[in-house]
Amino acid sequence: MIISKLQKQQIAEIKRLPLKKIKMNKGGPIIIIEDDLDDQEILTDIFHELDYKNEIIFFAEGEKALEYLTSTQVEPFIIFSDINMPKLNGMELREKIHQNEDLRLKSIPYLFFSTSAEQKHVVDAYSKSIQGFFVKPTAYKEIKETIRIIVSYWETCVSPNYVK
């Protein structure tokens, strides 16, 4: 490949620019989309015990979560979503978020946290550019440890977040 003198100058200028790490909004709210009230209560207790400073916002329906995400200026830290929900399920919600350029550019990690782990769901989920698929453990202690590991990972991760 032949590089012109102008291209070499442009490359040299780019290399001199400061490298910026763009981080996701780690202080933003944690969105949990879960229609099971018992699971909501368990997750509330776990997040309280883990003492995260992030606001926890629950939605029982995917439609309500989408309304919130498209109408707020707040950039959530992470989204935990169930798959099987009434009206707009987790897969459909993920598709709508991915199709919305403003939401897509916010680079909000979208994770499935569900009891449903059928092969079809896992394949469909990853085809929609999700950032993780976790089978919800049945034991409280295991749920808590899974949440701790997930949040810890995303707290240390750098994301190409949308810069305004």
Regions found by a protein language model. Name each.
Residues 44, 58-78:
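Acidic, metal-coordinating helix/loop segments flanking the phosphotransfer/catalytic sites
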Residues 85:
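Receiver (REC) domain active-site loop signature in two-component systems and cognate sites
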Residues 125-131:
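As written
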Residues 34:
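Conserved acidic carboxylate
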Residues 37-59:
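Two-component/phosphorelay signaling modules centered on CheY-like receiver
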Residues 138-149:
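C-terminal output helix
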